[in-house]
Amino acid sequence: MPKTRRPDGPPRRVRPAARRGQLAHVLLVDGNIGIGGAPERLLARAAALLAPGGSVLVEAGPHPGEWWCGTVRAGAGPDVPWACVGADALRALAPAAGLAVYAVSERGARTFVELVA
């Protein structure tokens, strides 16, 4: 995880990034499934990082069947690629990444989907 010494400073890496097959769990919450606007690629990358028996925990979008890809803008910043994927849509996306739904859990208004290889 890159860190900076100052808020506007360049990041420095404090430890090597994870390699294929090294992680027990990958956590994609708070909308992180949308990073890059290609959830299928993000799931494939997450699956590749998993050690045998590992899982990917994804916070799904608020609408179960939703699968939206496009761009968003935060304030005056540039457009960035983003996606939103509901729990049912994750069930459809998971097999292409070699994953399957193991469990779905709701906590208040939030839905979490655990995927396993």
Question: Where are each of the predicted segments found?
Answer:
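A short glycine-rich, Lys/Arg-flanked "PGG" loop and its adjoining helix->strand segment in the class I
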Residues: E40-S55
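Active-site glycine-rich loop that binds ribose-phosphate moieties when present
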Residues: P11-P16, G37-E40, A44
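Conserved class I S-adenosyl-L-methionine
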Residues: S55-A76
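A short SAM/SAH-binding and catalytic strip from SAM-dependent methyltransferases
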Residues: G21-R41
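S-adenosyl-L-methionine
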Residues: P2-G21
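Conserved beta-strand edge residues that scaffold enzyme active sites
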Residues: G9-R15, H63-P64, R107-A109
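Short alpha-helix
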Residues: V80-V104
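Core SAM-dependent methyltransferase catalytic element
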Residues: A97-A117
